[in-house]
């Protein structure tokens, strides 16, 4: 009983301390969100090398005046799922959105880890977005095997909730 009486002030004091638990660290850029995400879902993630990009980011929809609703696409290369075989180190595109709160409160979140249909590249040269069209420049194959190719793919971006299942359409 005496032990409980001595412990009571400590428990009361602990109950008065505000405990803050956040699952989302505020203030991160879309590229940093994807950098952290990629390290949890992939292996063999290397820094950019000359002529190739890593964590290249394009803005698809700018933040609104209150700092919400921005949408970005971040391109990176790695072995998604850590499969560890030939041709498993590929270009990945990750769609990120700032939802509901400004970046001061929460960072953007990953909303789609595979938004681009038909994208199979093993090197990312560049991504650009202009007038609703996303251009992805990259490489496939290996020079040592004589299969190396430079590839350019173009996608139409369709914004809005009604297109959430198919935001990008591969253009001819």
State each model region's role.
Residues 66-79, 128-138:
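Acidic/hydrophobic-patterned starts of short beta strands in beta-sheet-rich repeat architectures
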Residues 79-87, 141-147:
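Short consensus segments that form the blades of beta-propeller domains
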Residues 104-113, 164-170:
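Beta-propeller fold detector
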Residues 24-46, 122-172:
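Acidic, small-residue rich beta-repeat scaffolds with periodic aromatic anchors
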Residues 89-98, 150-157:
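Beta-propeller blade signature
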Residues 19-23:
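Sec/Tat signal peptide C-region and signal peptidase I cleavage site
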Residues 48-64, 121-126:
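Signature of short aromatic-glycine-proline-rich micro-motifs recurring in repeat-based ectodomains
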Residues 7-17:
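Bacterial N-terminal signal peptides
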